[in-house]
Amino acid sequence: MDYLVTIGLEIHAQILTRSKMFCGCSADYAHAPPNTHVCPVCMGLPGALPVPNRRAIELAALTGLALNCRISNENVISRKNYFYADLPSGYQRSQYDDPLCVDGWVEIEGDHGPKRIGLTRVHIEEDTGKLVHTNDGGSLVDFNRAGVPLMEIVSKPDLSSPEEARRYFQKLRQILVWIGVNSGDMESGALRCDANVSVRPVGQQEYGAKVEIKNINSFRFVERALAYEIERQIRALKAGEPIVQSTRGWDETSGTTVAQRTKEFAEDYRYFPEPDIPPLHLTDVWIAERRAELPELPDARRRRFIEEYELTAYDAGVLTDERAVSDFYEQAVAAARIRGVTPKDVANWMTGEFFRLLKETGETLEIAAQRLRPDYIGEVQELLNQGVITRTSAKEAFEASFREGRSPATIVAERGLAVIGAGDALTDLVRQAITGNPKVVEEYRRGKATAIKFLIGQVMKASRGQANPQAVQQALEQELARE
């Protein structure tokens, strides 16, 4: 029997603000000593009154617009009531009936081509504290994270495989980092995911029981956790066992999902409007201002790179994966065009030597760009186009510019990387190659025309790649004909 898989993801993304969602405490908790970024508001002490973070709401709305959502004019902050050690007040300020953003979508590469994944909502809430488990079985609580602004991005059950879920998660991360609302750091918990999955036999109309997998913090784990859970549910159905709606956790060590509790329903949280925060009214003018903040998004820029710069789909995709890379490329293209260098040539340097050096050094583009100016790419290609340097010398000059922050032209002059053309220097190298390889010379004279390629290689090696290959071949042919 075949089975249909239905998946929906809930992405929890911390909003990049300096202060917390409802108080003035610093939201930068990563390296702070435990429980130092706290106050009566985020600790839930009686009488402490919350004040919504304006910038957090603006960035959440910006996210909704980037995800093709409709922004709600009327918003209500609600209390989500439950008890857990990392929730000091006994409730979480969130949204329920009236979320900030509704009815969006994201396009991904599905299993069978482009696929639009619907979004139910994007709502704002506050993060919880962090539990630290000790070796003796105890647990400690750090409340520095409690109250940090958070968005929950809820997809419709439109995903059909673990691979699609991974691609969707990756696309969301790309967009959130691109527009500057989230760091994308999954290791620190700034971006995490809950996955809902159900399985049903082909032909069955109603969905199977939904199982939620909590707190997944990597693309690889999303795919692995869903693959395992789907297989577990299929095995149970084949054995005639019912699937119970429940919450499970992903155990990366064993590669399995582990039962945690029976799945709660919304009624269990007893949502009600937060009495200390009046409804938020967002005007159409305010929403238009947020829309004006929205930059060109990755998909739109990728399409433009293909059309305007005539890049391949692959190159355009690589160069729009990160906004910093994409912006650097555009700056390099603008400078290169003045020199008659094409956008494709710039793309080749970026996706080739530049990315290789970034990987080799472990640097981010932001760090490397403090040395390598965007116009250096066009400069080194111009020297190559003019025949001043060879491809080998161009790579050497580019790497030196990357590491030293000096112009390619300066490096070419200092290192003597200019092409060795016709003249005494080239003649000397050619004669050395002929003298040092008598057997190859003899083969050439007996009619083996390809033997000259070996001699060309010897000259190029001796010149450290600086000799012009065409000039080398011409000089060799002249010398060999003379002897």
From Swiss-Prot:
Give the enzyme's EC designation: 6.3.5.-
Which controlled-vocabulary keywords does the entry list? ATP-binding, Ligase, Nucleotide-binding, Protein biosynthesis
A Pfam family hit: GatB_N
Q: InterPro entries attached here?
A: Asn/Gln-tRNA_amidoTrfase_suB/E, Asn/Gln-tRNA_Trfase_suB/E_cat, Asn/Gln_amidotransferase, Asn/Gln_tRNA_amidoTrase-B-like, GatB, GatB_C_1, GatB_Yqey_C_2, Gln-tRNA_amidoTrfase_suB_CS
One GO MF term attached to the UniProt entry: glutaminyl-tRNA synthase (glutamine-hydrolyzing) activity
Reaction(s) catalysed by this chain, per the record, are: L-glutamyl-tRNA(Gln) + L-glutamine + ATP + H2O = L-glutaminyl-tRNA(Gln) + L-glutamate + ADP + phosphate + H(+); L-aspartyl-tRNA(Asn) + L-glutamine + ATP + H2O = L-asparaginyl-tRNA(Asn) + L-glutamate + ADP + phosphate + 2 H(+)
Cystine pairs annotated here are none
Q: Which SMART domains match?
A: GatB_Yqey
The biological processes this protein is annotated with in GO are:
glutaminyl-tRNAGln biosynthesis via transamidation; translation
Tell me which family the UniProt entry assigns to this protein: Belongs to the GatB/GatE family. GatB subfamily.
**Record note on quaternary structure:** Heterotrimer of A, B and C subunits.
- HAMAP family the UniProt entry points to: GatB
**Physiological role:** Allows the formation of correctly charged Asn-tRNA(Asn) or Gln-tRNA(Gln) through the transamidation of misacylated Asp-tRNA(Asn) or Glu-tRNA(Gln) in organisms which lack either or both of asparaginyl-tRNA or glutaminyl-tRNA synthetases. The reaction takes place in the presence of glutamine and ATP through an activated phospho-Asp-tRNA(Asn) or phospho-Glu-tRNA(Gln).
Q: What name does the UniProt record give this protein?
A: Aspartyl/glutamyl-tRNA(Asn/Gln) amidotransferase subunit B
Which source organism? Roseiflexus castenholzii (strain DSM 13941 / HLO8)
